[in-house]
Structures are given as C-alpha cells and as structure tokens.
UniProtKB/Swiss-Prot annotation:
NCBIfam families: rpsB_bact. InterPro entries: Ribosomal_uS2, Ribosomal_uS2_bac/mit/plastid, Ribosomal_uS2_CS, Ribosomal_uS2_flav_dom_sf. Gene3D superfamilies: Glucose-6-phosphate isomerase like protein, domain 1, Helix hairpin bin. Pfam families: Ribosomal_S2. One of its GO terms (biological process) is translation. Keywords: Ribonucleoprotein, Ribosomal protein. This is Small ribosomal subunit protein uS2. One of its GO terms (cellular component) is cytosolic small ribosomal subunit. Belongs to the universal ribosomal protein uS2 family. The keyword Ribosomal protein applies. Coiled coil: none annotated. GO terms for molecular function: structural constituent of ribosome.
Amino acid sequence: MDMALPEFSMRQLLEAGVHYGHQTARWNPKMAEFIYGDRNGIHIVDLTQTVPMLDQALKVVRDTVAKGGRILFVGTKRQAQKPIAEAAEKCAQHYMNHRWLGGTLTNWKTVSQSIQRLKNLDELLAHGAEGLTKKERLNMEREQQKLQASLGGIREMGGTPDLIFIIDVGKEDLAIAEAQKLGIPVVAVVDTNNSPKGVDYIIPGNDDAARAIALYCDLVSRAALDGMSAQMGAAGIDLGALDVAPEEETLEA
C-alpha cells in the first residue's frame, strides 16, 4: 500500500536556513561527511544529503504511526518548546518540552505513578476541593502546575514510545541514552557541532533557527497524520466521515 508522505523541496530547506551549521571552530568531526563546505566561517550542511535523509525519517514516522505506534517529540530548548508541543498535539502524539526527566523511558513505572498523581490532582481540584483549606488547595495547585509542566505532554502516552523525534541531540543526550538502552529508534536533527552517535535516522541540519525548527516539526507532524489516516484506512474508517459525525449527534440532543 503506497501511503502519502508530506512533500518538501530543497528550496524550502534553504529558505528555512536548514543549511546553516555552526561556526567552523565549533564543529564536530563526526559530522564531516554531511558538511558541504564553509562560508564566512560557518559550516554549510550538504542539503543533497539532508533531502533523502529527511525523507527517510518521515517514512519511519509515518510507518510507526500506521502500525499503531506512539511517537515522543522531544525539544526542551527555548525556541523548540512551543513548536514541539504544537506539532505533537496536532497529530495526537506525545511530547516533552520542559526538561528531560531522567528515567522517563528507563523508569516508566515511576513516571507513570507521577502521571497518575497529576490526573488525581486534576480530578480533586475540579470536583472535590470543597473540604480543603485555602493553603491545602494552593499547595495542590502548585504541585499540579509543576507536574503539568513536566508531564503534561506524556500524560496520555500510556507506556514507552515506539519512536522518538529529537531537536538538538547535544541538549537531549539523556533522552538518546535512555532510548538506546531500551532499543527505541531515534529520529533527530543533528547540527554540525554535535555527534550523530545514537541516532538511527539522522537529519543533518540547523537545530537553532526558528524557521528550520518549525519546518521539521510541521513535516514530522504531517507524516504522523499520514500514518494515522493509513491506519484508519486499513481499519475501514473514512476520515472524511469523521468530520461530520459529531454535529449530527448534537442535533439529536
């Protein structure tokens, strides 16, 4: 079954600044094969390699979701936080954008207990808070906000993910180490100052520019949605029909 895949062009990558690496002095020799050259002391990524590698990464994302797999989007640096969360939410997947919690993958049991605590707090504060003192309620709200910030994006994950998508492997080295330990494949954007070690599907490119980050996130999110429609298509569900169904129900009520 030939499934759709989000399309992108070399020109889009150029316009988003995907080819701009870091200062040549900060380079990591392990990325040498993906570097085209340098311009004014900045390494330029070889986009003729990025294009097929990005395409390969998107296929893996799509196929993982088509098989019913879960994807965890990870990007905790300031400029990645919002696009990572939005992209994951758009395709009903999961994200971590606050800071990587050690043990998120390797100690899922403990993490899922914290998620349960968050759900209990939500429930309590929504319904059963009448008998609480102001101080108790305040403490609960504080705990809820803290848990929501770090776990909100994975509260519905329900287990370790089947694939991880990462922006900035230098910053997210802990996530990569945990994924490697569990044999979870990693798709990641790797800039010229980082090592691609531990990354199964490398996307060589700029990991700092807002436009580049937005482009990767959008493409990965769309690939996941393509996988979802393939999965539903295989199950005989018509996505077009899903859009109208809820309105009919409200009419009856």
